[in-house]
């Protein structure tokens, strides 16, 4: 449900304890003062309630909702209202609405809204700090453990294996070269024996020649 101007005047009449004429004049004078100030480009600030001001809109292109045609809109000035901190706090429920007296007091709602805004981030910051503190040692331990194992055990074993394997290879290579050398020596000696065996064969024809001479 909404409240119109007549209903507002009735409520104001009861609160002021005056007649309807005075309440009507009060409402009209307040509205007239705000409209004239905003028209000039000034802003009307009511602490805790809000600010009435003028906003400038640049030229833009709009669309007609009925026809769908594009329409150029000239730059204009538009009245605007910015609600105050106490007004926002009361509507959102952050600040309790008093049963009696003014709903918005100067310097009361604003301080309460600031306290709520300061307390909420502080709690979040402390929780985040605690989580970071618990996670940090775990990460440090995880980084230190692999470093010790890698530094003590792994490189030593690999180094020993690396030193032993070349020694075995060298001894095997020496044995292979020794076997090859002996084979080569045997190969060089074999032709000498064959040559010695061939030499007596040349002498055999000489004996046959002497035998033939005796027969003659």
UniProtKB/Swiss-Prot annotation:
Induction details: Increased expression under iron limitation (at protein level). Expressed at all growth phases in rich and minial medium; more protein in mid- to late-log and stationary phases (at protein level). Increased expression under oxidative stress or growth on isoniazid (INH), decreased expression under nitrosative or acidic stress, or growth on rifampicin (at protein level).
Location in the cell: Cytoplasm, Nucleoid; Secreted, Cell wall
Oxidoreductase listed as a keyword: yes
Positions of the pro-segment in this chain: 2
CDD domains named in the record: HU
GO molecular function term, any single one: structural constituent of chromatin
Its job: A nucleoid-associated protein (NAP) that probably plays a role in chromosome compactation. Binds DNA non-specifically, with greater affinity for supercoiled than linear DNA, binds well to nicked DNA, gapped and cruciform DNA. Has a preference for A:T rich DNA. Required for activation of the mtbB operon. Binds the mtbB promoter in the presence of iron, binding is seen with as little as 25 uM Fe(2+) and increases with increasing Fe(2+). RNase E and HupB jointly contribute to cellular adaptation to changing growth conditions and survival during antibiotic treatment and in the host. Binds Fe(3+) but not Fe(2+). Has ferroxidase activity, converts Fe(2+) into Fe(3+) and in the presence of H(2)O(2) prevents the generation of hydroxyl radicals (the Fenton reaction). Protects DNA from damage in the presence of FeSO(4) and H(2)O(2). May function in iron storage. Involved in iron uptake by bacteria (either Fe(3+) or extracellular carboxymycobactin); antibodies against HupB block uptake of both. Following uptake iron is mostly found in the iron siderophores carboxymycobactin (CMb, extracellular) or mycobactin (Mb, lipophilic).
Name under which the protein is recorded: DNA-binding protein HupB
Organism annotation: Mycobacterium tuberculosis (strain ATCC 25618 / H37Rv)
